[in-house]
Amino acid sequence: MSSDSEMAIFGEAAPFLRKSEKERIEAQNKPFDAKTSVFVVDPKESYVKAIVQSREGGKVTAKTEAGATVTVKEDQVFSMNPPKYDKIEDMAMMTHLHEPAVLYNLKERYAAWMIYTYSGLFCVTVNPYKWLPVYNPEVVTAYRGKKRQEAPPHIFSISDNAYQFMLTDRENQSILITGESGAGKTVNTKRVIQYFATIAVTGEKKKEEPASGKMQGTLEDQIISANPLLEAFGNAKTVRNDNSSRFGKFIRIHFGATGKLASADIETYLLEKSRVTFQLKAERSYHIFYQILSNKKPELIEMLLITTNPYDFAFVSQGEITVPSIDDQEELMATDSAVDILGFTADEKVAIYKLTGAVMHYGNMKFKQKQREEQAEPDGTEVADKAAYLTSLNSADLLKSLCYPRVKVGNEFVTKGQTVQQVYNAVGALAKAIYEKMFLWMVTRINQQLDTKQPRQYFIGVLDIAGFEIFDFNSLEQLCINFTNEKLQQFFNHHMFVLEQEEYKKEGIEWEFIDFGMDLAACIELIEKPMGIFSILEEECMFPKATDTSFKNKLYEQHLGKSNNFQKPKPAKGKPEAHFSLVHYAGTVDYNIAGWLDKNKDPLNETVVGLYQKSAMKTLAFLFSGAQTAEAEGGGGKKGGKKKGSSFQTVSALFRENLNKLMTNLRSTHPHFVRCIIPNETKTPGAMEHELVLHQLRCNGVLEGIRICRKGFPSRILYADFKQRYKVLNASAIPEGQFIDSKKASEKLLGSIEIDHTQYKFGHTKVFFKAGLLGTLEEMRDEKLAQLITRTQAICRGFLMRVEFRKMMERRESIFCIQYNIRAFMNVKHWPWMKLYFKIKPLLKSAETEKEMANMKEEFEKTKEELAKTEAKRKELEEKMVTLMQEKNDLQLQVQAEADALADAEERCDQLIKTKIQLEAKIKEVTERAEDEEEINAELTAKKRKLEDECSELKKDIDDLELTLAKVEKEKHATENKVKNLTEEMAGLDETIAKLTKEKKALQEAHQQTLDDLQMEEDKVNTLTKAKTKLEQQVDDLEGSLEQEKKLCMDLERAKRKLEGDLKLAQESTMDTENDKQQLNEKLKKKEFEMSNLQGKIEDEQALAIQLQKKIKELQARIEELEEEIEAERASRAKAEKQRSDLSRELEEISERLEEAGGATSAQIEMNKKREAEFQKMRRDLEESTLQHEATAAALRKKHADSVAELGEQIDSLQRVKQKLEKEKSELKMEINDLASNMETVSKAKANFEKMCRTLEDQLSEIKTKEEEQQRLINELSAQKARLHTESGEFSRQLDEKDAMVSQLSRGKQAFTQQIEELKRQLEEETKAKSTLAHALQSARHDCDLLREQYEEEQEAKAELQRGMSKANSEVAQWRTKYETDAIQRTEELEEAKKKLAQRLQDAEEHVEAVNSKCASLEKTKQRLQNEVEDLMIDVERSNAACIALDKKQRNFDKVLAEWKQKYEETQAELEASQKESRSLSTELFKVKNAYEESLDHLETLKRENKNLQQEISDLTEQIAEGGKHIHELEKVKKQLDHEKSELQTSLEEAEASLEHEEGKILRIQLELNQVKSEIDRKIAEKDEELDQLKRNHLRVVESMQSTLDAEIRSRNDALRIKKKMEGDLNEMEIQLNHANRQAAEALRNLRNTQGILKDTQLHLDDAIRGQDDLKEQLAMVERRANLMQAEVEELRASLERTERGRKMAEQELLDASERVQLLHTQNTSLINTKKKLETDISQIQGEMEDIVQEARNAEEKAKKAITDAAMMAEELKKEQDTSAHLERMKKNMEQTVKDLQLRLDEAEQLALKGGKKQIQKLEARVRELESEVESEQKHNVEAVKGLRKHERRVKELTYQTEEDRKNILRLQDLVDKLQTKVKAYKRQAEEAEEQSNVNLAKFRKLQHELEEAKERADIAESQVNKLRVKSREVHTKVISEE
């Protein structure tokens, strides 16, 4: 897997798994100096890379990568590995194996996102804190079946290796995943389960119970679904990890014999239940609380009576309440579905949620202190009512039990007062207990569901448990976790080096075995030995007055100074107090023992527990049904008798028991180790903190593994690789030119090198090196290579320079040659013949090209003709191919059916032989078991008699006890005075009891010694059995070879059938592709027809668009002409205005001068007055005329602007229509192109089919020849069939029945398939409707967005207009001020203007005439434009109608497309159904034929064997039934004895109650006695527990013996008797123990009337004595059993002889079987030959069929693409139509607003005119304002400014010509007269203009009326659109609700 091409199977995950070839080559070629490249110790980074600069006196000076120079000791410098080891996948292969090398290898791989790395047997994984594509399905398939060295490191590789080892080695496997919280343990566990669920699927769904209504999935789904449920209730956010598992789990995945998933189960460890009631600030409680509060399922909020605010609940809101990386709503749905998939009932599901809600309510319960008392009382009952409702309890009883719990004092129950803090503690303990028990119950229920009862043979266990923990504050939880890791590390060390040393042994290397597992034994024994930490903790928990201090003192007494691993911690500032330290393999840990005793006892409020047991909620009652309360002990003896010992089981004892089970499971498996690492505390991807990672490597045991690895030979290389790599060190040692073995070459090479020869060893295939030696060899190799390379470089450089010199010489000669030729050319360049040559040369080439073009045209015509001929031939060949394919399919079906029948017959024959052998073996086993059962029955009857004798003796003892009790009654009255003395005696009795316990422990040790002796005897038996197994091994080998031959035959037959089936499927697929091709051709023709129609429509639309474009262009040209005319009009008007202003200024100047100069005579004054009056009159007339003219011009200008704007909008709408049509045209062109490409692909497919046809014809001829051979075989088989036909009558009848069943099933299947197809069709219709509605919604949203954008644009345009208006107003004001200031200065200009006034007046008249003519022409153009606008409106309506028609046609086209698509899908579904049906029918037919042939072959032999077997089985079943009855009777006796014992116990407790009733007067003494009694009860419980422990020990012995017995039964020996006898001994001991208990109970029943205190002590003393006697009896019985074992060894020897005889018989049977095998072998050889021929034919056909299927698929995909493109085009067309309609409406609205504004503007102008008439007196000021307005329109006219400046200069000149002006006054009068006449003319023109404006106003009103009607139509259309949108929303909501 080294090349990039081989890594391609991993897809996009390849760069995240292994370096590319380029990177590897670059790494090997990197410069590297092995002597100077090192790692040095750094206080910040732990280790850094550096270059050694000098070494002096044990000190090393080095320069780090950062540029710093450091000096360190020699032992703080570590050599760096060569570059070829960079990012190495297995760190155990590194040359220098130490901490910095491991650290930097992990760091560099992590930087390249390669998160998995091997370290020997470990797989180390670093949390990437981001998603990587390394878990995709393609990666799963890539790792399947790959060996570890063939694929990059990965959790899938570990999983697959475990799976393959399980299948090949037939051994259970385990995967141990450890690491700190947040390191990725849970994710890797999920990936392991995902991998197994993917590669080992069963494919069968669990049977669903119709009554239960569970939504169960497959086993794989349930295994995967168990994770979300466990994570919801067992995972929480911590400081380091958002999804931290707060419990350990061991998931066992069971597999069947074939490797398929069979079942699974889960074991959990150390759930952190304290998190239920308390969390740190940065953490939160378990996910389930926040999932429920997320309100994803509102029904839960109502059911649990809670709110959605986590801060309303105290237990869950102490820290964080949300996690960014977790969606609680989605997780709730996943949890809820997991509960359903895992098969929880509805009641159980409700109970889970209710109990979770009750825990939240418990946190809100409030209590307060009573006044003047310490007693607590409830502070409100509302929360308690909710909690009680959810737990189906009475609220008052719950509060009473919490505040006033009942305590058993003596024989009475007394209510005890509780403080507020005690009540809160009790509530928290109950909440934690409910949650813990519910979690454990859920795990049990999951295990029940995952247990499918399918046969299971092996399992793979996945252990996800917390890694080693070293915190500042370490408590009991940390001790448990660290102890678990210590045991796991010991297990790893032992396993790792057992394998390592086995390899040494296999390679033939001398090695002394070292058990590295013993390295950790001292710490483990310190914790778990009899007087270890856990033992002392449990002992202290039994004493009522024990404290943490007493516990610490006992620890110091036992271990301080005696064990090196137990130390007294040194006090550290700023850290919590530590009481003792333990030296673990990962470091020294300081432990604080505060509260350990309470944690270990785990007390609960027994009164509330009693309420829970009586709860109406079955689940809650079941959870606490196992809890033993004081009331249950006092009242219910029957229930309390069985679990009295287990009720006081401590947390540590339960933990040790679970840990021992786990280690037992792991020891029985082959383990695989995964270590998870946290790279940094900040969850930053790609960053790595050195100190943190090193700490985890130590805690995870990675560095421990490296330490042990260095003691051996960690580096090893194959001989061939070593020879190739290190041959350069001494090439002369290996002779050239002759063959030499790689091993010998390596030995010679190493012998010739100067190294320490004790540091390496030679194995059979590899050379092994001690750590560091390989690095030395690498340094030597580098030095040698450096010498060789320098020498090679010198040679190469000399050679290259010589080559360069030769080139330079050749270049010199070439230059001389070129110079000579150029000089010659320069001489002949002007020669006339050479010029002629230059001209003719190009003409020759053009003639040649014309000839080539002519030839190419001829060839083109020929190819056209050939193409037509080939098309005709192709059609003929296609028709022939169809007929030939049908014939070929028929023939192949016949051949396949006959071959299958033959193969199945042979397979059935082999299976019958196997079943016969198995049945014979089972018969032997059953007979042996029956004999053993008879012996056991005899032994049990004897033991029963002995027990009856012992019962009679015990009755005598009871009589003696009754006499003593009578004496005790007499002494009753004196007991009151002796109470104090008795308490002292009780203390003495305690001491005696302690002595008895010590004696009992000594007896237990002796018992353990006897068990060890027994184990030794069993070992001896095992050695004997090994000798026997060796003899039987030969038989097994022969049988194995026979089985292999049979398997080979079966495999060949299966492969043959598979190939034939594939051939048949390929033929069917070819037929399907032919049908698909025909359908596609038909669709293509229809498409072409539709496309031709669409093309015609497109051409029509294009013609219409061209016409519209022409009209638009004409209108635009006309608009441009009008604009030019307007501009000319404006210029002329400005010119006239300027002239008028000049004249007015000149008149004013003249008048002023006349006033100044005209004072000479009164006549002149009067003249001046008259002239001035006339002048004023003329000015007024002129101003009125100019005002009217300006008003009319403004009106005309506005109307023209309106018409231009309307035309512009119409042009815009037409352009939009044009763009829309062009878009449709482009889309249709794209569709045509797609269809053309589809046609091309179809034509290519046709060509391929022709090619296939030819090949198939050739194959058909070959198949025909093969068919003849098959026909010959068929004839032979038919002859055999005829011979066997006489015996097939009965089987033919069975066959008919099966056929009937098959037909019935097929009919049912057809009905079901029809239903399925109908449902699929409905689903597709619903999805289509949904998609259309989604598209409609999308288009509506798009319309809305467009409207919003247009509205914003209009608003912006409006704002711009307003800004323009304001700007214009400001400019008007500026001009007004300017002209007001300039008017004062213009008096001087009038004198200059006098001369030119006449000329200018004349020009003004001409200009007015021109203006009038232009006004008339404008009116005409306006009329013409209005007509054209109306025509354009008509055209627009036509185009809209055409668009609507196109829309309708498009919809019809969409409908046709949808119908064809639906038909295609229906035919496809029918085709698939028919294919499936045909396959199932063919398989059923094959099965029936196989059964028929099998019955023909072995009918007689089966009948005979069946009769014999039935007889033997009936005999054996009778014997077994008798044995079972006898055992059942014994069990009944045992149950009866247990019942009697429980009755005695109740009588004892009644006696105690009566005694305590009489002592009620003395309460203080009674309490003391109760304490004493409770201690004795505890000791009795301890004794009962010890007895139970003895029972468990005996049961373990029995189980181990049972396992050995089963193995011996399989190997046909008689060792079963040993186990049965031991079981008998065990039953005898149990019966004796039960008898003793019954006698004790009867004695206690007789003591009911005793009332004295001595009775209690006497009873316990008697119990202790009896326990001692029982132990002595058991010891004697064990000794007797050891003697019996010696006798049974002798029996085993006899059984060995019997097995020898059996072996000889088996050899005889083997000879018979070998003869049969020979016959079958001959038949197989002939079949194999035929099979090989068929395989070659099938492989050819299969390859060709794959090509055909691929081409058909491509054609189908393109057709689908065309359909989807058409649908998209239709949708886009619809969207464009909607947008155009919307824009049309917007346009009309804007037109209306423009017209409104125009009206307002006209009204304002009219008001201004009216106001002007009223203010005639202020005409002069008004003239200036109008002049400023006129000037504002010509602000950009530069000529006016220049003219003004010239006029100013002229005015200055006119001051000198005043006399000439006086002479011209008469002439001016004449001019005034003329002006008056012209003013009258102007008035007439103004009236005419007013009439025209009235006409235009009428037209405007008409247009406005039409606009209002259009607006109404738009409103109606908009209301219809809104209705459609409402309907679409209703349909959408219905679709969503239905989904």
Swiss-Prot record:
A single GO BP: muscle contraction
Modified residues (Pros-methylhistidine): H757
Pfam families (alphabetical): Myosin_head, Myosin_N, Myosin_tail_1
Domain called IQ: residue spans: 785-814
A Gene Ontology term for the protein's cellular component: muscle myosin complex
Superkingdom as given in the UniProt entry: Eukaryota
All residue ranges annotated as the Myosin N-terminal SH3-like domain in the record: 33-82
Binding site for ATP: G179, E180, S181, G182, A183, G184, K185, T186
Keyword terms of this UniProt record: Actin-binding, ATP-binding, Calmodulin-binding, Coiled coil, Cytoplasm, Methylation, Motor protein, Muscle protein, Myosin, Nucleotide-binding, Phosphoprotein, Thick filament
Assembly and interaction partners: Muscle myosin is a hexameric protein that consists of 2 heavy chain subunits (MHC), 2 alkali light chain subunits (MLC) and 2 regulatory light chain subunits (MLC-2).
Record remark: domains: The rodlike tail sequence is highly repetitive, showing cycles of a 28-residue repeat pattern composed of 4 heptapeptides, characteristic for alpha-helical coiled coils.
Biological function: Muscle contraction.
Name of this chain's protein: Myosin-4
Gene giving rise to this polypeptide: MYH4
